[in-house]
Structure formats: structure tokens, C-alpha cells
Amino acid sequence: MVRKLVQSFLFIALFFVSCNTRQKQKAKPSFLSAKEVVRLNQVVYKSTIAESLSQYSPEFEAVFIPEAINGNFAFIAKKKETEQYALVIRGSVIEFSNEGFQNFVMQDFNIFTIKSWPYTDTIQQAYVSNGAWIGFQNLLQLRDKSSGLTIKEFIEQKIPVEASFVITGHSLGGNLAYPMAGYLKNELPAEKGGNLQLITFGAPAVGNAAFVKDMEEKFPSAERYTTDKDIATVFPDMDKVREIAHITGLDSVLQLSKLSIPGINKLKTSDLLDIAGEILKATKVINETNRYVQSQRHLRLLTVDAAAVPADTSYTAESLFNRAYQFHKVDRYADLLGVNPLE
């Protein structure tokens, strides 16, 4: 009798241990943190991803590396010891020279035409900028050099169901992370679409209020990091651009009467921004339906000390964009999250 009781006890104990082990094995890992993925957003601008991860983030490995298409590039990183993944979308390469920042605002960020966004659940009349649509289409074409798979195919075929997956990007990479995340959430099987998270840094607005509402429903806990002095994140809202220009001192730097711009004399900063705003309205980019907005639910606001970026009193166009760049660069966001700049 005693022997049978002991055997029964051992059987029950082993059963509970086995169940507990299976539960642990099936437990979904947490999402990578903003601090972890901002480091990956620094790495994505390096020319050699695998080597840069080994040097700067040895706890990660690159499992998906494609060739860039029309300047758009992204890679998938995996934390070696866990099933935690991130799709890291590169921003505009040209912004990483101070002189190139103006190209990012005036040329790369193609906002003057809009595109209907089809990957919503119940939301109607969602639109994104034409620039975001073009970049998103390029991302869909990326194929891993090793497996030949697209991003969606790689997630479906190579990433375990229980894995966590963050879509992230800085600047235009963050801009493109929004449509890419919305697309994956909509198109992946439910068991994988439920394991997605969205984290961006310094991302300009992507689309209208309907697009943002759909993204907030899909990703209620997404994190959109911006600083209080980053003009890129409020463009093309000219009222907010004017406000940040004043806070950062850009309005004092942008003294157009002192700039070497043919045909422009004694034009105030506020006049320039008013003209830009009128252009956006005249082209019907801004109206009640299609006004570009950012998610306030996703917002994670970081504060920058303006004194950390001394003003340049040379009053040149270069000095204006250089100062804006200093508040927008990925290393600024990394620093605010406690991550060192890369060499």
C-alpha cells in the first residue's frame, strides 16, 4: 500500500514538473526594449551589418540581410539566447551628413501626393504619403541574400510562432516602420500577427487620422519616441514647425536676409513657414480628411537641453540644417535612452 502511494506521488510530481516545463517552453518572450532596438537603429546605418553587430551588439545576430532596393534597406536581428527578433528599417542615408539634412526634408520626404492605404481592418479613408508608399513597396521587395525569402515569407517560414517581433526604425526608417507594421499585422497569420510590436525614433508623420486610428487599434502599446526639439517629427505641420524653430533657436539662425539665396531679401522665418503652409493647402495635401497627424497614444516624449547644441551664428543655410540634424540624429535618441554613440 505504501509503495503504491509513493509511486502515485512520484507520478503526480513528474506530471506537474512536465506540465510546468512545457508551459515555460511555450511562454512567449517579452518584446525587445526601446534601449535595445535604438542600438540596432544605430547599427543599421553601418555598411557591414553582421560585423557591426558583432562589434557593437554581440548579443544579437543578423538572420535576414538583403540588398538595398532604391536606397531602402532593412535587416532582421535575433537575440542569440532568446526568441526575440527585430526588423530594423534604415532611414535616409543622405541625412547622415549635415548638409544632406535639407534633402531629407525637401526631397526625400515626398508628401505632396497621397496614396490610399488598403491594409486596414474596419477603418475607411486611410491615406499615407506617396513617399511612404514608395518606400514601403521597396521594402516588400527585399529578399534575404541567403534564403531568397521576402520579409513576410521569412517571418512565416523561419521565425517560431512563440517568438516576439519588433518593427523599428529611425527617421525615414521610423516613417516606413508604420506602414510595414500595419501590413504585417494585417497579412500574417493571426498566431504570428499577435506577436508584433512597433517602436520608432524621430519618425515623420506617415498618413492621416484614419491611418493613425487603424495603427493605434493594431498596436495599442506601440512606442513613438520623439524629442521636444526634433522638427522632422512634426513636419509638415507648419504651426508645430514654427513652434520648434523658435524653441531651438532655428528662427534666429534662419535670417533669410543674410542667406545667399538669389531673389530672396528680407523675408522673415514666419513668412517662409506661412508660405510653406499655404503651398501644402493649395496642393490639397492638408484638408480635413488628409491632414497628416501623429499618434498621441504612441508618443514617448524625450526632452533635450538646447544648450547641448550650441547655435551657429554664421547664418548660412548649412548652419540651419546642421542644427536641426543635431536634434534629430539617431545618436541623440540613443543618448537620451542611455546608449553610447557608435564609433
List each language-model region with its residue ranges:
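Bacterial Sec-dependent N-terminal signal peptides
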Residues: 1-28
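N-terminal low-complexity, Ser/Thr- and acidic-residue-enriched intrinsically disordered segments
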Residues: 20-82, 90-92
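Short, polar loop/linker segments at the starts of domains and inter-domain junctions
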Residues: 53-57, 102-105, 242
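A conserved cap/lid and substrate-binding interface adjacent to the catalytic center
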Residues: 61-168, 188-191, 195, 218-219
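Short regulatory "switch" loops immediately downstream of catalytic or recognition motifs
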Residues: 94, 148, 152, 184-186, ...
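Serine-dependent carboxylesterase/thioesterase catalytic core
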Residues: 152-235
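Lipolytic serine-hydrolase domain surface
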Residues: 212-343
